[in-house]
């Protein structure tokens, strides 16, 4: 149940395990629809006075896994990209960042840490183990490369 207005869809059938795509206008920001990540065909639409109010609303909540923006205005696009800390962002497109291995996919904060898909996933879930091995014999590099110590100069004079 929602306190918002179901503008489209809203039906479900347990026998066929189907849920209609649903558009909910102005749900209560405290209800579960607005408090949890949505993994279903439900689209909440909120009425805001301006772009800054929309950005403030998003930023007052846990960071989203993805943010979607539809605009022709470059200034609006840049403001939302820099002002909304989401795992990923799509401008004038939906879900494509999830469907391609060419873009990293993942969240920030409560929606997940890291990024996966394609090369990004391989690197994210691989551990680069640093190993430095120092030989047990004397370090001749200290005598070969500058800056030279007095000990290196004395050895060089004896050899040459």
Each PLM stretch: what is its role?
Residues 9-14, 94-95:
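Short, solvent-exposed loop/turn elements at beta->coil junctions and helix N-caps
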Residues 5-6, 64:
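Residue-level detector of anion-binding/catalytic polar loops
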Residues 6-10, 69-70:
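Short beta-strand segments
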């Amino acid at each position: 149940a929602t306190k918002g207005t179901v503008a489209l869809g809203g039906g479900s059938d347990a026998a066929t395990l189907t849920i209609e795509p649903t558009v909910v206008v102005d749900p209560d920001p405290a209800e579960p629809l607005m408090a949890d990540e949505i993994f279903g065909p439900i689209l909440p639409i909120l009425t805001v006075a301006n772009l800054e109010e929309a950005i403030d609303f998003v930023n007052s909540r846990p960071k989203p896994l993805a943010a979607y923006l539809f605009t022709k205005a470059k200034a609006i696009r840049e403001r939302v990209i820099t002002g909304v800390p989401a795992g990923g962002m799509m401008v004038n497109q939906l879900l494509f960042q999830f469907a391609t291995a060419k873009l990293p996919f993942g969240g920030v904060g409560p929606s997940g840490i890291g990024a996966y898909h394609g090369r990004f996933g391989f690197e994210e879930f691989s551990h680069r183990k640093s190993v430095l091995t120092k030989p047990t014999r004397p370090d001749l590099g200290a005598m070969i490369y500058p800056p030279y110590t007095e000990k290196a100069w004395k050895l060089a004079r004896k050899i040459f």
